């Protein structure tokens, strides 16, 4: 595990974008595992800046996203399909045929999970997986106590996750989807490099627990202690307890 300490959110975003940029430059046809949520947005902004400056070319890049809400049409403004297009895909030259997310409108969970696992296999696996971390240690939508050996699966979101995500749905908990498709821990651990971004004092406790405590399904992110190429990039507040 490599830890990169940064002074603030902007610096964290810049460092994370540097690592992703290097991956694209070194392997133009790389497979990027991408994440949603507030934390990676700054890194995506930096990647768009570098693309606009002529420093990055996404034309051969393939993306596979971590997760998607089940039952939400992709055109919904809070679907992760919409999030990724709004924050990254619409602003760079990635081939739409190379963009992959779970299909939240496929209500046949078994078939959709099997399909998405096959998509990831067919592109050769993930070269670099970007992650955030939840206050309870979840990564993707792998919630506490989920088995470490799962591939893509359908999950019932915990009340804590639903509460955390209601800010994206006008603060109305009833509008937040209650299920999601997510890459499993096994899939994440098979990525050749894993990059986690974390910021703010609110994440300090879980960072300490996940990366300096026992490896346990109770804290899904703790498994990353065992990954051979895991980079944690955080600001001073998030890393204040380690």
PLM region descriptions:
Residues 1-32:
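N-terminal glycine-/serine-/threonine-rich phosphate-binding loop
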Residues 56-129:
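Ligand-binding beta-strand-loop-alpha-helix segment within the catalytic cores
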Residues 140-185:
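Class I SAM-dependent methyltransferase SAM-binding "motif I" and its flanking Rossmann-like core
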């Amino acid at each position: 595990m490599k830890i990169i300490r940064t002074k603030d959110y902007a610096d964290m975003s810049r460092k994370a974008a540097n690592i992703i940029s290097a991956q694209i430059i070194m392997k133009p046809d790389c497979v990027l595992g991408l994440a949603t949520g507030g934390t990676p947005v700054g890194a995506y902004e930096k990647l768009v800046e570098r693309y606009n400056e002529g420093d990055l070319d996404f034309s051969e890049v393939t993306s596979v996203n971590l997760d998607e809400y089940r039952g939400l049409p992709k055109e919904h403004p809070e679907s992760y399909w919409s999030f990724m297009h709004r924050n990254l895909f619409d602003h760079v030259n990635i081939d739409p045929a190379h963009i992959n997310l779970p299909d939240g409108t496929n209500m046949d969970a078994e078939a959709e999970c099997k399909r998405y696992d096959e998509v990831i296999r067919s592109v050769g696996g993930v070269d670099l997986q970007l992650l955030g971390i939840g206050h309870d240690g979840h990564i993707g939508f792998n919630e506490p106590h989920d088995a470490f050996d799962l591939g893509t699966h359908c999950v019932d979101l915990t009340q804590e996750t639903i509460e955390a995500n209601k800010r994206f749905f006008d603060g109305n908990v009833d509008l937040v989807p209650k299920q999601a498709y997510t890459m499993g821990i096994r899939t994440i651990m098979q990525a050749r490099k894993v990059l986690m971004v974390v910021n703010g004092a609110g994440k300090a406790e879980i960072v300490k627990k996940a990366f300096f405590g026992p490896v346990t399904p109770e804290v899904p992110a703790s498994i990353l202690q065992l990954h051979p190429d895991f980079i944690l990039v955080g600001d001073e507040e998030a890393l204040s307890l380690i």
